[in-house]
Amino acid sequence: MGRTRRRNSGTLSNVTTDGLAPPAIESVSGELVGYSLPELPAHLVYPLDVFADAFTREIERGRKAASHIHAHVVGLARDCDRALVNNLAAMDSLRTMFGEMTLHIEENDSRDRTKEILADYSSSRPWATVNCKDLGRIHRGSEFAGQRTVELAEYRTACQASVPDGADLVIVFDFDAKGGFSPVGVAHGIHLLAAERHCACVASVSLIRSRVAQWDGTTTTMLDQWIHYDAWALRLNSWFDDYRAGMGSWKHQWIPPVGSPFVPVCSAFGGMAIYRAGAYRAGRYTGEDCEHVKFHQTLPGRIYLNPSMRVVMDW
């Protein structure tokens, strides 16, 4: 977006924010065109007036801190070429926020142009590395805990090995997010890590547009609605897997406003999380549950959900 928004009935601030999903860049994509992010409701992007002044101050503090930081970005990519086009362009932009930024991506078994895009991108950027493998594994997209999470834990452990000695922070990002992430949210998350010395991780609110039943007292109507996506990794005040127990679907409806206070949690991810490098190295991924949950159980330090960190997964 990169623009100043007009006030809407006095509820939303006119804070200028950076947009999600920057345009695709020709040097990465060739003729491949990335996704065009649909218009998001303003309340999902901009802070309410009550949070606006503090939000602006915290972003600037985060940017100032980031300018002295070495951030290492890691992530997974498989069969996500169009999302990858936008997200790699976003990495080029994000890199300007930091004193230094490096990048490593683990890929396996892609059948689209993902491998080609990664190879082209890393060949012209010495600060970026990729590890592409053909393991002959099927894509287990709809599975919960099981072989899928065992394999994801394996790939994420490989990402841990890529962290350079000089890194201060590690940003874990899922490169298949079709709508990308908010750079302002990253700055806001860095503010929290700089301000709270016991904080080991800040996680995002991820969004997806889905058909949702709405009840008006007499009839049920199915409507398109933006909801909170990563409910399984989100464990609020215990490690109990309420989602697979049939008690956690309410979390899809919980989207705390941008600029609102950080929420202490046992676990959260949301497509992007920022870790202190030492804490990230110390954690251990396993696959008996959501791999992020198992990792966070071994993490030294506190974990917060940051309502100002936004990732758009799909629509």
PLM segments and residue spans:
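N-proximal low-complexity "stem/linker" segments adjacent to membrane-targeting elements
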Residues: 10-90
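C-terminal catalytic/acceptor-binding lobe
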Residues: 14, 19-37, 250-315
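A conserved acidic beta->alpha catalytic loop
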Residues: 80-81, 106-117, 135-137, 175-177
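Active-site-proximal specificity loops/subdomain of glycosyltransferases
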Residues: 123-166
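Short beta-strand-to-loop acidic/aromatic patch adjacent to the donor-nucleotide binding site
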Residues: 166-180
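Conserved catalytic core of nucleotide-sugar-dependent glycosyltransferases
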Residues: 178-274, 281-283
